[in-house]
A protein has these predicted regions:
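Conserved beta-strand/loop scaffold segments within soluble protein domains that form the structured core
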Residues: 3, 13-214
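Acidic-histidine catalytic/liganding microenvironments
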Residues: 6
């Protein structure tokens, strides 16, 4: 399915992702791949995607659009298991319509020479739930920055991650949830195990807009 400009309207007009995020800006500037998934009304679907780069010295700029229509449910597994010398810059733009659910699993197990920069922006309408679980086993650098907006009542976002780092590896992690309506719920938890000289950062933030405060 062709990706249209309007698929990114919500994303492009919001200020949840910083305008000076140069990785996101580079993704838009040098975009060279992407996919679009639409789960139709009231469908229950399971999908597994293996993101594999076959050649060395490549930089993948990939922008994906995932839409769950009203009453639908999607279980999505994304695997990143690259063993070559390349870089993947991924942006997922996710929309959940009323009463929809998305369980999103990100499995990251790359070699020391493969860098993964992954950013996501999810927007949740009334009674929808977005659950994201990140598993980082990579030996190469990984940046996980994930943002969610709860734009209508009774919507939920649950952003969780776990990372296992060793040697001189580094990982940067960030989650940010905006409550833009009343009676919404969110959860942000990242945990990690570091050995040797490995380093990691994690920043989480929850913003409750005035209109969402009772």
């Amino acid at each position: 399915t062709k990706i249209l400009d309007q698929d990114y309207n919500d994303f492009s007009k919001n200020d949840t992702i910083e305008n000076n995020d140069h990785f996101v800006n580079l993704n838009s500037l040098f975009l060279n791949s992407g996919f679009k998934i639409i789960i139709k009304n009231n469908n229950n679907i399971k999908i597994k995607i293996s993101n594999i780069v076959t050649d060395d010295d490549l930089t993948i700029f990939q922008k994906n659009n995932i839409i769950c229509e009203e009453g639908s449910s999607l279980s999505l597994i994304e695997e990143y298991e690259n063993k070559n010398n390349s870089t993947s810059n991924i942006l997922n733009v996710i929309k959940l319509e009323k009463n929809s659910q998305l369980n999103h699993f990100l499995i990251q197990d790359n070699s020391p020479n493969h860098n993964l920069i992954i950013t996501s922006h999810s927007s949740c309408k009334k009674d929808s739930t977005y659950t994201q679980k990140v598993y980082n086993f990579s030996e190469g650098y990984v940046r996980n920055f994930h943002y969610s907006e709860l734009i209508e009542t009774n919507s939920e976002a649950d952003l969780q991650g776990i990372f296992f780092l060793k040697d001189n590896n580094t990982s940067n992690n960030k989650t940010f949830v905006k409550h833009l309506a009343e009676d919404c719920k969110s959860n942000q938890v990242y945990k990690g195990i570091l050995n040797d000289r490995a380093k990691a950062t994690y920043f989480s933030n929850t913003h409750v807009d005035q209109v969402a405060q009772k």
